[in-house]
Amino acid sequence: MFIKKKIDLGHGKVITIETGKMAKQADGSAVVTMNDTMVLATVVSSKTPPSPNQDFFPLQVEYREKYSAAGKFPGGFFKREGRPSEKEILSARLIDRALRPLFPDGYYQETQIIISVISSDTINDADVLGGIAASAAIMVSDIPFANPMSEVRVGRINGLFIVNPDINELAQSDMDICIGGTEDTICMLEGEMKEISEAEMLDAIKFGHDAIKKICALQRELAAEVAKPKRPFSPTVAPDELVNFVEEHCSAELKALAYTPLAKEERAEKTKAIYTQTIRKTLTHFTDRVGPDQIEADPTSAFCLNEHMIEECIHAVEKKVMRHMILDDGKRLDGRTLEQVRPISIELGLIPRAHGSALFTRGETQALVTLTLGTKKDAQSVDTLTDDKDKRFMLHYNFPPFSVGEIGRVGGAGRREIGHGNLAERAIKMVMPSEQEFPYTVRLVSDILESNGSSSMASVCGGTLAAMDGGIPLKKPVSGIAMGLIKEGDRYAVLSDILGNEDHLGDMDFKVAGTRDGITACQMDIKIDGLDYHILETALEQARKGRLHILDVMAEAIPESRADIGKYAPRLTTIQIPVDAIGMVIGKGGETIRSITEETGAEINIDDDGTVTIACSSPEATKAAVETIKTLVSKPEVGTIYMGKVRDIRDELGAFVEFLPKTDGLVHISEIARERIAKVSDVLKVGDRIKVKLIDVRKDPRTGKTKFALSIKALLDTDQQAETNGEAKPARD
């Protein structure tokens, strides 16, 4: 049955949701359209019961942009889509993070959601449409999922909010915020902003939530018309006798441990010991009490002998103890108050060959960030359905397994690393100088050496410090902090600078980065329903205080960017040449520019407007390259010395030398040496590179052509005079 629904969100943003036409063998499918951008989402959930020991929800979200959607060919030899791009991975994470908390607790069926962009108008990003399509596909399926989710993008132009702005509108906007939520609450937030205030952020969220409510209502209408019954689902629940026994035998020890401030590793060891001891006691207790007859009469009693179920019960007690400690006593696992930030230490310039470096340590989280400066050719080429550009600022985040004391795979960046790096990059991008002010390509690499929460925000702080250490004139320093939440009924506590355990056992992970004057990036994930705006307001204000405290500590280490770039960084010199002289500098097949590079060691880039950028770590080599290029594009002047190439030899006349591109002059036989020579070929041969001096310029009265007279002998006389006077001879290329 084909059903189609439509909603107008204003400003010409009309969204259509349809189902029943495409991918009908999937458990659920939906197509969402806005203008000429169309997204197909499908969902399939396994009907095979999960393993009794499974304790996680295996949800896989894949987002793919088909090049054919925009009438483009994929790049590369094979001309077909390959592994997911960074943009596709980030879009998949955006949708995954909003959907995952909305599945019912205990639903562990393997589930796969595939979102395919099947048409693109190249100006509307399909990521938020993919979130709507995925939710609609689940709503019309038989998969348990009570509340629809919608995603929108919010921008602001001249003080007016706009929903789902296209790329042209985003270019004028001072914010780009993706919001995911249900009719009742916000469950996901991510975006970048140009130093907006906390109040402005809250207004943007409220504006986006109004649109989300309308789209969610439309999904409910769609699902009601499909009227597909949901498959029966009963979450596995531990027997009361098991829950009570476990709590009785581990609650006191876990509480005593929670109230004792310990390092991460020591706490983990002591917690593991309590788990092991409690499991042993529980198995001993129930082995004699739960036999085959009882299991046959009550199959759930078998859970009393299941180690995995016992672990789940202990974990529930651990979570309860920590949450009550925070809510009742305002104390945290490491002894801090709710708003207190962990101790911070900063070391700059510790990597000698890097162009800038910083070691940022906050508590037991440590990031080593290094800076590399490059030229325009080092920029990353980005090719998506809505964008085709060179990216000149990038931040890469690495999270090796040793940072949490584990053994693991070492290879390419995973989805989490790409997501964390992107967040830190967006935070710092807003304060980067313009290309005209700082024409370098910039790469920051954050290697997490230790982790106990907030490693992405440590990357923001470390990245800012490394950039300042490397002499990048940032508009303002940026810091970041991760906020947490513990909420039970009407009681709640907002935590500043959360630990890993507080993230794992808490209800929110809200990362906020910005300058003293406003927010530049944020990311929020919520695990509960019912987050109200008052809690968000509290979290934003508390994050502002923490951010300012961190900026104060950073300012003590380095108050402002260094006056100069690192000594090993390439020096960029920019000169302007006439557009019609570009070919002259490049030469036939790149011969001229290649020879300049080989002789000076400088890297040279020429833009179509005649802007020449010369990169070299040696000032002398840079000067030589600049002089050579200026000489190439200048008009020939008598008395100037050039490096030329012998093109032709006439034994009784002289040698024709190309001393400028496509410009030849004659070195008469009498101007080759001080002594008389019989034949030019005795001294020179075609292809020789020689220094010559321009001694005369005149027009041929018969042809009107300009002729140039060159001399080698004049240079020999000059060299002899310089040696007599103890002067250095001039060198010009």
UniProtKB/Swiss-Prot annotation:
Cofactor: Mg(2+)
Reaction catalyzed: RNA(n+1) + phosphate = RNA(n) + a ribonucleoside 5'-diphosphate
Pfam families: KH_1, PNPase, RNase_PH, RNase_PH_C, S1
Alphabetically ordered keywords of this record: Cytoplasm, Magnesium, Metal-binding, Nucleotidyltransferase, RNA-binding, Transferase
Subcellular location: Cytoplasm
Function: Involved in mRNA degradation. Catalyzes the phosphorolysis of single-stranded polyribonucleotides processively in the 3'- to 5'-direction.
This protein's name: Polyribonucleotide nucleotidyltransferase
Biological source species: Chlorobaculum tepidum (strain ATCC 49652 / DSM 12025 / NBRC 103806 / TLS)
